[in-house]
């Protein structure tokens, strides 16, 4: 039996399934304005609380007669875009700070890391609440507050990676050749450690979706009539007894997408670092042993 290629080992069933879920969410976000069957903010008093599978409304309508499917698709645009913006913000700010602090070390590194330790001791959502209380509620403030809350962990991760990598022989060689420190950090060290960071950044997308949905659920994120999955969840909670799908649909979507993102990030981590792969169970060992014995008998 031929061994699978390195790329083939990555495309396991769980990788493919989780990847499909993520691609569907991204496709819905990108094409939201085109594929929505109705205007998500169009009010129709004659169609309030229509149940699922009603004529023209697959998932029914809310208390204002707005099509739930259209609002979920448009909510995907807001939720996915916000999640990617949050991760982009933490990467652009956190990674350079962590790399520079780890490369140079010294008192500045010690002071900045102690500040990050204090910030990390505050739960991300609590820190977001504090920032929103200072700067006001809204989608932009929500994205920035969560992004700021995520920066310390990203910076600490980048710092820990470069502390190990800067001792490599190639770094010493570049130093002896007179290369600028910034060029060594961002053009030579960063490409060698970025693969380790990718799995964490992928997982942060799922965390960002949940965090932003939480803020919107509490009325601190995106404001009506615009919708994301958090506002739809809050609206469904208020009107659960009139149409349970209003609550179930956004809850299931948030769960599916975040679980898919986490599984996909685990797959990336296992692919990058084979030592992270789970050990086979006893039954799997037994099946392999039986397979080997059968091949040996066939060969005889």
List each language-model region with its residue ranges.
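Hydrophobic alpha-helical transmembrane segments of membrane transport/permease proteins
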Residues: 12, 28-63, 220-226
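C-terminal transmembrane helix and the adjacent membrane-cytosol boundary/short C-terminal tail
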Residues: 195, 202-203, 244-300
């Amino acid at each position: 039996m031929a061994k699978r290629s390195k790329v083939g080992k990555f495309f396991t069933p769980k990788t493919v399934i989780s990847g499909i879920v993520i691609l569907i969410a991204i496709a819905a976000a990108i094409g939201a304005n085109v594929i929505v069957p109705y205007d998500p903010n169009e009010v129709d008093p004659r169609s309030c609380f229509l149940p699922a599978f009603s004529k023209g409304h697959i998932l029914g309508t809310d208390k204002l007669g707005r099509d739930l499917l259209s609002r979920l698709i448009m909510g995907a645009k807001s939720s996915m875009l916000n999640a990617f913006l949050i991760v982009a913000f933490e990467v652009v700010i956190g990674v350079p700070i962590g790399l520079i602090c780890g490369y140079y070390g010294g008192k500045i590194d010690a002071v900045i890391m102690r500040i990050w330790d204090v910030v990390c001791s505050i739960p991300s959502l609590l820190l977001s609440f504090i920032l929103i209380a200072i700067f006001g509620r809204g989608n932009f403030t929500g994205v920035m507050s969560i992004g700021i809350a995520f920066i310390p962990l990203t910076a600490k991760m980048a710092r820990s990676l470069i502390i190990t990598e800067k001792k490599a022989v190639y770094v010493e060689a570049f130093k002896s050749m007179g290369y600028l420190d910034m060029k060594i950090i961002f053009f030579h060290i960063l490409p060698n450690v970025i693969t380790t960071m990718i799995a964490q950044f992928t997982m942060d997308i799922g965390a960002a979706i949940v965090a932003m949905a939480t803020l919107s659920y509490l009325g601190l994120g995106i404001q009506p009539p615009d919708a994301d999955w958090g506002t739809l969840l809050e609206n469904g909670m208020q009107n659960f007894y009139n149409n349970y799908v209003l609550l179930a649909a956004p809850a299931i979507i948030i769960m599916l997408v975040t679980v898919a993102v986490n599984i996909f990030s685990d797959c990336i981590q296992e692919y990058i670092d084979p030592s992270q792969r789970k050990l086979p169970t006893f039954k799997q060992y037994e099946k392999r042993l039986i397979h080997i014995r059968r091949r040996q008998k066939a060969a005889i």
